[in-house]
Amino acid sequence: MSNFIDKTFTVIADILLKVLPASKQEKQAFSYYRAGMSAQSEGKYAEALENYYEALQLEEDPYDRSYTLYNIGLIYGNNGNYSQALEYYHQALELNSNLPQALNNIAVIYHSQGLNALQMQNQDKNLEIRNDEYLELAKEFFDKAAEYWRQALKLAPDNYPGAQNWLKVTGRQISEEYF
Protein backbone atom coordinates (compact mmCIF):
# COMPACT_ATOMS: atom_id res chain seq x y z
CA MET A 1 0.00 0.00 0.00
CA SER A 2 2.80 2.46 0.84
CA ASN A 3 4.36 1.82 -2.58
CA PHE A 4 1.05 2.83 -4.19
CA ILE A 5 0.91 5.97 -2.06
CA ASP A 6 4.52 6.83 -2.90
CA LYS A 7 3.87 6.39 -6.64
CA THR A 8 0.66 8.41 -6.42
CA PHE A 9 2.53 11.20 -4.62
CA THR A 10 5.21 11.16 -7.32
CA VAL A 11 2.64 11.45 -10.12
CA ILE A 12 0.79 14.27 -8.39
CA ALA A 13 4.04 16.07 -7.59
CA ASP A 14 5.14 15.84 -11.23
CA ILE A 15 1.83 17.32 -12.37
CA LEU A 16 2.05 20.13 -9.82
CA LEU A 17 5.59 20.96 -10.89
CA LYS A 18 4.40 21.35 -14.47
CA VAL A 19 1.17 23.23 -13.74
CA LEU A 20 1.98 25.59 -10.88
CA PRO A 21 4.03 28.69 -11.52
CA ALA A 22 7.40 28.31 -9.84
CA SER A 23 10.94 29.32 -10.58
CA LYS A 24 13.46 26.78 -11.82
CA GLN A 25 15.18 26.93 -8.43
CA GLU A 26 11.90 26.26 -6.57
CA LYS A 27 11.15 23.31 -8.82
CA GLN A 28 14.64 21.93 -8.33
CA ALA A 29 14.36 22.32 -4.54
CA PHE A 30 11.05 20.47 -4.57
CA SER A 31 12.53 17.71 -6.72
CA TYR A 32 15.29 17.20 -4.16
CA TYR A 33 12.75 17.27 -1.34
CA ARG A 34 10.59 14.71 -3.10
CA ALA A 35 13.61 12.48 -3.77
CA GLY A 36 14.51 12.77 -0.08
CA MET A 37 11.02 11.72 0.97
CA SER A 38 11.11 8.77 -1.39
CA ALA A 39 14.52 7.61 -0.15
CA GLN A 40 13.43 8.10 3.46
CA SER A 41 10.31 6.00 2.95
CA GLU A 42 12.53 3.21 1.58
CA GLY A 43 14.89 3.40 4.55
CA LYS A 44 17.73 4.89 2.49
CA TYR A 45 18.59 7.50 5.08
CA ALA A 46 21.99 8.61 3.75
CA GLU A 47 20.47 9.22 0.32
CA ALA A 48 17.51 11.01 1.89
CA LEU A 49 19.83 13.31 3.86
CA GLU A 50 21.82 14.16 0.73
CA ASN A 51 18.63 15.15 -1.07
CA TYR A 52 17.28 17.13 1.88
CA TYR A 53 20.55 19.05 2.22
CA GLU A 54 20.44 19.86 -1.50
CA ALA A 55 16.84 21.04 -1.10
CA LEU A 56 17.88 23.29 1.79
CA GLN A 57 20.57 24.89 -0.36
CA LEU A 58 17.97 25.85 -2.97
CA GLU A 59 14.77 26.39 -1.00
CA GLU A 60 14.11 29.98 0.04
CA ASP A 61 10.56 29.67 1.40
CA PRO A 62 10.71 29.38 5.22
CA TYR A 63 7.58 27.22 5.40
CA ASP A 64 8.96 24.69 2.91
CA ARG A 65 12.37 24.77 4.59
CA SER A 66 10.70 23.92 7.91
CA TYR A 67 9.41 20.61 6.56
CA THR A 68 12.79 19.72 5.12
CA LEU A 69 14.42 20.46 8.48
CA TYR A 70 11.73 18.43 10.24
CA ASN A 71 12.37 15.42 7.99
CA ILE A 72 16.11 15.67 8.64
CA GLY A 73 15.29 15.64 12.35
CA LEU A 74 13.20 12.52 11.84
CA ILE A 75 16.10 10.70 10.23
CA TYR A 76 18.53 11.65 12.99
CA GLY A 77 15.98 10.67 15.64
CA ASN A 78 15.26 7.33 13.98
CA ASN A 79 18.98 6.61 13.97
CA GLY A 80 19.39 7.44 17.66
CA ASN A 81 21.20 10.74 17.18
CA TYR A 82 18.88 12.67 19.46
CA SER A 83 20.99 15.81 19.87
CA GLN A 84 21.05 16.29 16.08
CA ALA A 85 17.34 15.52 15.87
CA LEU A 86 16.58 18.15 18.52
CA GLU A 87 18.69 20.69 16.67
CA TYR A 88 16.80 20.18 13.41
CA TYR A 89 13.38 20.10 15.09
CA HIS A 90 14.15 23.43 16.77
CA GLN A 91 15.32 24.93 13.48
CA ALA A 92 12.09 23.78 11.84
CA LEU A 93 10.04 25.36 14.63
CA GLU A 94 11.91 28.65 14.27
CA LEU A 95 10.65 28.83 10.68
CA ASN A 96 7.20 27.35 11.30
CA SER A 97 5.81 27.34 14.83
CA ASN A 98 2.77 25.35 13.67
CA LEU A 99 4.46 21.93 13.63
CA PRO A 100 2.88 19.91 16.44
CA GLN A 101 4.64 16.80 15.17
CA ALA A 102 8.04 18.43 15.80
CA LEU A 103 6.94 19.47 19.29
CA ASN A 104 5.73 15.92 19.94
CA ASN A 105 9.01 14.41 18.73
CA ILE A 106 11.01 16.77 20.96
CA ALA A 107 8.84 15.69 23.90
CA VAL A 108 9.35 12.02 23.06
CA ILE A 109 13.13 12.50 23.08
CA TYR A 110 13.06 14.28 26.46
CA HIS A 111 10.72 11.64 27.89
CA SER A 112 13.09 8.91 26.69
CA GLN A 113 16.03 10.70 28.28
CA GLY A 114 14.09 10.88 31.55
CA LEU A 115 13.44 7.15 31.43
CA ASN A 116 17.13 6.56 30.71
CA ALA A 117 18.09 8.62 33.77
CA LEU A 118 15.77 6.53 35.92
CA GLN A 119 17.24 3.36 34.47
CA MET A 120 20.76 4.61 35.23
CA GLN A 121 19.70 5.25 38.82
CA ASN A 122 18.57 1.64 39.13
CA GLN A 123 21.56 0.09 37.35
CA ASP A 124 24.60 2.13 38.25
CA LYS A 125 24.75 2.00 42.03
CA ASN A 126 28.57 2.25 41.91
CA LEU A 127 28.81 5.53 40.05
CA GLU A 128 29.75 8.69 41.90
CA ILE A 129 26.49 10.40 41.05
CA ARG A 130 23.91 9.98 43.80
CA ASN A 131 20.44 8.54 43.35
CA ASP A 132 18.78 11.88 44.08
CA GLU A 133 20.81 13.45 41.28
CA TYR A 134 19.51 10.83 38.84
CA LEU A 135 15.99 11.53 40.05
CA GLU A 136 16.47 15.27 39.60
CA LEU A 137 17.86 14.75 36.11
CA ALA A 138 14.91 12.53 35.22
CA LYS A 139 12.49 15.14 36.59
CA GLU A 140 14.12 17.85 34.45
CA PHE A 141 13.76 15.73 31.32
CA PHE A 142 10.16 14.84 32.16
CA ASP A 143 9.33 18.51 32.80
CA LYS A 144 10.77 19.41 29.38
CA ALA A 145 8.76 16.62 27.78
CA ALA A 146 5.62 17.96 29.45
CA GLU A 147 6.33 21.48 28.21
CA TYR A 148 6.62 20.35 24.59
CA TRP A 149 3.66 17.98 24.77
CA ARG A 150 1.48 20.80 26.12
CA GLN A 151 2.55 22.98 23.19
CA ALA A 152 1.83 20.19 20.70
CA LEU A 153 -1.60 19.61 22.23
CA LYS A 154 -2.46 23.30 21.99
CA LEU A 155 -1.87 23.07 18.24
CA ALA A 156 -3.45 19.63 17.78
CA PRO A 157 -5.82 18.94 20.70
CA ASP A 158 -7.14 15.67 19.28
CA ASN A 159 -3.70 14.18 18.70
CA TYR A 160 -1.27 12.45 21.02
CA PRO A 161 -3.64 10.62 23.41
CA GLY A 162 -0.66 8.93 25.06
CA ALA A 163 0.83 12.31 25.87
CA GLN A 164 -2.52 13.55 27.18
CA ASN A 165 -2.75 10.55 29.48
CA TRP A 166 0.87 10.88 30.65
CA LEU A 167 0.34 14.55 31.49
CA LYS A 168 -2.76 13.68 33.53
CA VAL A 169 -1.20 10.70 35.32
CA THR A 170 1.98 12.58 36.24
CA GLY A 171 0.12 15.74 37.30
CA ARG A 172 1.86 17.82 34.66
CA GLN A 173 -1.21 19.08 32.85
CA ILE A 174 -1.81 22.78 33.32
CA SER A 175 -5.39 23.07 32.17
CA GLU A 176 -8.22 21.12 30.66
CA GLU A 177 -8.33 23.35 27.56
CA TYR A 178 -7.05 20.70 25.17
CA PHE A 179 -8.72 17.65 26.68
UniProtKB/Swiss-Prot annotation:
Recorded superkingdom: Eukaryota
InterPro entries found in the cross-reference section: PSI_Ycf3_assembly, TPR-like_helical_dom_sf, TPR_rpt, Ycf3/AcsC/BcsC/TPR_MFPF
SUPFAM superfamilies: TPR-like (SSF48452)
GO biological process: photosynthesis
A GO-annotated cellular component: chloroplast thylakoid membrane
TPR repeats: 29-62, 66-99, 126-159
Keywords noted in UniProt: Chloroplast, Membrane, Photosynthesis, Plastid, Repeat, Thylakoid, TPR repeat
NCBIfam families: PRK02603.1
Function per UniProt: Essential for the assembly of the photosystem I (PSI) complex. May act as a chaperone-like factor to guide the assembly of the PSI subunits.
Name by which UniProt lists this protein: Photosystem I assembly protein Ycf3
Organism: Trieres chinensis
Gene expressing this chain: ycf3
